[in-house]
């Protein structure tokens, strides 16, 4: 092989030697904690913000097949660990996935722990046979307002995500009178308690839980904030545990059990993290005649989760007060599932 051909090989070999011969203080935890000043780093979509392996600073977790050290840990929420190879060389490793089932998505096989972009709009991760995706584009909602009566999303050349634009007002349209009627009036206006500082507070009902069992997500849209801007809020929800066999609790002669009693308090789990408190939560039951039972009255409370790395995160979570059993049941994998569920009333938050 010519000297020219050996050039890239020699450079790669020198780089490998440099990585392996770096001082251990940059990888192990013998050095004192020195975190960068300022706010915590902002991680790319789908990448967890975790404490480093020394418990000092918040860092963006390393992903599958990336180099890792004791100070630069792998993403624990994706089942990754740092494989250092031989115990004699515990300085630099490679992020490796724990044993888990692969995923098939779009005709491509992905290993457990592997991240990929299904399109320019979504970042996805395979975790033990299941694929989860987070949007890369904004999912905000914008209603007509006096300063922007005709908002609409448009696809701009060279950009993947659609963006909001405000068209110029047009005469003799339906939107103009609608805006006038939308503003509060002394006699026929909305509840005065919902008006503050030129802002008509609007909040939608919470959507149905994204999962019929296990931990899911429920969302709503509100402008109840300092800037009176519409924003999407989310909360965790669990209609019922997946492992519970509720049909055996149905009394003889009955076809449904609406709110089964849980024998003992439980702790919730989220991405490997566990709630710090135990909860005697209510769940919705099941029917044997084709009806489904869903939350009817709920409330929203904060729940603190503690992760294996010591990080504590606080999440809003739905707690069920009452359930209703009905025939408006969605089909399996129905993307319009929330349209079939009855609305949830009396939510306190």
UniProtKB/Swiss-Prot annotation:
Residues 198-243 form the TSP type-1 domain. Disulfide bonds join 29-54, 33-56, 35-57, 43-60, 68-82, 74-95, 256-293, 273-307, 284-323, 287-325, 292-329. One of its GO terms (biological process) is reactive oxygen species metabolic process. One of its GO terms (molecular function) is heparin binding. Major connective tissue mitoattractant secreted by vascular endothelial cells. Promotes proliferation and differentiation of chondrocytes. Is involved in the stimulation of osteoblast differentiation and has a critical role in osteogenesis. Mediates heparin- and divalent cation-dependent cell adhesion in many cell types including fibroblasts, myofibroblasts, endothelial and epithelial cells. Enhances fibroblast growth factor-induced DNA synthesis. The keyword Transmembrane does not apply. The keyword Transferase does not apply. This is CCN family member 2. Keywords: Cell adhesion, Disulfide bond, DNA synthesis, Extracellular matrix, Heparin-binding, Secreted, Signal. SMART domains: CT, IB, TSP1, VWC. Residues 27-98 form the IGFBP N-terminal domain. Belongs to the CCN family. It holds the Pfam family VWC. PANTHER family: CCN FAMILY MEMBER 2, CONNECTIVE TISSUE GROWTH FACTOR-RELATED. Its main location: secreted. Residues 256-330 form the CTCK domain. Residues 101-167 form the VWFC domain. Residues 247-349 are annotated as: Heparin-binding. InterPro entries: CCN, Cys_knot_C, Glyco_hormone_CN, Growth_fac_rcpt_cys_sf, IGFBP-like, IGFBP_CNN, Insulin_GF-bd_Cys-rich_CS, TSP1_CCN. GO terms for cellular component: extracellular matrix; extracellular space; Golgi apparatus. It comes from the Eukaryota. Gene3D superfamilies: Thrombospondin type-1 (TSP1) repeat (2.20.100.10). It is found in: Secreted, Extracellular space, Extracellular matrix; Secreted. Residues 1-26 form the signal peptide. It comes from Bos taurus (Bovine). Monomer. Interacts with TSKU.
